[in-house]
């Protein structure tokens, strides 16, 4: 679970599907993958780039998460501080605190009958790739992506770029604006009252934005 492996998987997928021209959308970690791919592998055929609730700096991301933690209850703040200091992320107090944090900035519990079946049906999940790649939670990057810092390289991106984020997102307005300020001629759309999955909380507006963006940036040759 390293950036090189994931980029090579993307390269292999494009080759296998013969995707000579694409609009590349990266959501969350996928945006980091897209940035790594574009900045370090010189791909061709990228019509436009869509960076959805993502980041260009792991250190800024962690700093912003800790800033938001300071708005939580003292009990939750204390539980998170103890977990980070001791490395014990299994205590009941920490699990409750982290759940509260994720509900505030990522996603809540989906109710059966009020959400698509794909979100509510039982599923097997694993943590190994997330733990190895990022860390124990969103605000403690310790994995293979902990050193992801490409903000200073964003000036080299010369393709149309759309940045999407929510006001209550893990991708805070500062994280999103940092990318917007460093990618020339980029467009930034900030969705009010949305967390880390804007596409799920403002679905119609998100789809309309993408449709407009794709139409605007579709190559004439097609």
Task: Give, region by region, the residue ranges found by the protein language model.
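Active-site acidic short loop of glycosyltransferases
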Residues: 15-21, 43, 158-159, 185
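Conserved acidic catalytic loop of the alpha/beta-hydrolase fold
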Residues: 4-22
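Conserved loop-alpha-helix segment in the C-terminal half of the alpha/beta-hydrolase fold
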Residues: 151-194
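Catalytic active-site module of serine/aspartate enzymes centered on a nucleophile-bearing elbow/loop
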Residues: 185-222
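Conserved hydrolase catalytic core segment
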Residues: 20-64
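Conserved donor sugar-nucleotide recognition element shared by glycan-biosynthetic enzymes
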Residues: 2-10, 172, 199
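Alpha/beta-hydrolase
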Residues: 70-159
């Amino acid at each position: 679970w390293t950036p090189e492996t994931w980029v090579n998987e993307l390269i292999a997928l494009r080759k296998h599907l013969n995707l000579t021209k694409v609009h590349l959308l990266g959501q969350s970690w996928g945006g980091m993958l897209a940035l790594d791919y574009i900045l370090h592998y010189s791909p061709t055929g990228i019509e436009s780039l869509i960076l959805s609730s993502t980041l260009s700096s792991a250190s800024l991301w962690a700093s912003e998460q800790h800033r938001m933690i300071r708005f939580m209850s003292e009990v939750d703040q204390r539980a998170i501080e103890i977990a980070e200091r001791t490395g014990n992320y299994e205590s009941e107090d920490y699990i409750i605190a982290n759940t509260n944090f994720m509900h505030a900035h990522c996603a809540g519990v989906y109710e059966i009958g009020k959400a698509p079946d794909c979100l509510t049906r039982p599923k097997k999940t694993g943590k190994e790739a997330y733990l190895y790649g990022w860390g124990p939670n969103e605000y403690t990057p310790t994995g293979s992506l902990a050193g992801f810092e490409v903000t200073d390289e964003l000036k080299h991106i010369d393709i149309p770029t759309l940045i999407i984020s929510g006001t209550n997102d893990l991708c805070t307005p500062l994280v999103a604006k940092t990318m917007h300020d460093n990618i020339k001629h980029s467009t930034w759309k900030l969705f009010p009252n949305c967390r880390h999955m804007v596409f799920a909380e403002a679905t119609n507006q998100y789809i309309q934005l993408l449709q407009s963006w794709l139409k605007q940036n579709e190559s004439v040759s097609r």
